[in-house]
A protein has these predicted regions:
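Short gly/ser-rich loop at a beta-strand->alpha-helix junction or flexible surface loop bordering the NTP-binding
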Residues: 50-61, 67-139
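Residues that recognize and position ribonucleotide moieties
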Residues: 17, 89, 157
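Short beta-edge/loop segments at beta->alpha junctions of small alpha/beta modules
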Residues: 2-85
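A residue-level signal for conserved active-site and pocket-lining positions in enzyme catalytic cores
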Residues: 24, 96, 164
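C-terminal intrinsically disordered extensions
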Residues: 24, 121-152, 207-208
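Hydrophobic alpha-helical interaction segments
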Residues: 141-217
């Protein structure tokens, strides 16, 4: 039996599509396959697709033929983060605004706020670009909408109030003026619960709370 056939059959029997290097290595050891050669061969033939380093999606024969896979890019991101041990994360900033239909702009990247890592440049996952922004753990305790897909995979995004506060907070960290933050808040003031916004602001530096209060009048 060819390597790819054995590998694909083995994971199909396990109903496992998303796997780690350790998962693949274990099956290679079972069949006596060289791990490195097997991995490279599967990649070169388009069966093994990288989500993150050491985390992959394994296409079956039908997916390879049709070009259609079981999961969406957001689902692959979610599962990849889970396997990397990133428990706290959500789609935020402009990405959250888009998901809530609060903007009609089209953005080149999706913003993923998380507890573990920053990336200066976007990371491409299956044709979509994601920019990872690290924030402090205390900012994961409120304002996050948690949904589950038809494939039972969690997808998180910030609500409108938290989204604006995150934007204001990151604006401030990047050196933007208070006037820029006020302009941002005023633009979306009609789309948020002002009491919730003020309450959430207690979790951010006091300067943010003062600017929010000024923007709301």
């Amino acid at each position: 039996m060819k390597r790819k056939d054995a590998i694909i059959r083995e994971f199909s029997l396990k109903k496992k599509k998303i796997l780690t290097s350790d998962d693949l290595r274990a099956v290679c050891d079972k069949y006596g396959f060289d791990f490195g050669r097997t991995k490279i061969g599967l990649m070169n033939k388009g069966y093994l697709l990288t989500i993150f380093r050491g985390i992959y999606y394994l296409r079956d024969f039908n997916e390879k033929k049709t070009g259609v896979i079981k999961y969406s890019t957001d689902e692959l991101l979610s599962e990849g983060l889970r396997l990397k041990g990133v428990g706290n994360w959500y789609f935020g900033l402009n990405t959250a605004l888009k998901r809530m239909n609060l903007t009609h702009e089209i953005f080149a990247v999706d913003y993923v706020l998380n507890e573990r890592f920053n990336r200066v440049r976007p990371m491409e996952i299956f044709g979509s670009n994601f920019l990872f922004v690290k924030i402090k753990p205390s900012l994961f305790s409120f304002g996050i909408e948690k949904t589950t897909t038809a494939n039972d995979i969690p997808i998180n995004y910030s609500d409108a109030e938290k989204t604006l506060l995150d934007m204001a907070y990151l604006y401030r960290l990047s050196g933007k003026s208070g006037e820029a933050i006020i302009s941002l808040i005023e633009e979306y003031a009609g789309d948020v619960d002002k009491k919730k916004l003020i309450n959430y602001a207690k979790n951010y530096p006091k300067t943010i709370g003062k600017i929010i209060a000024e923007a709301l009048g």
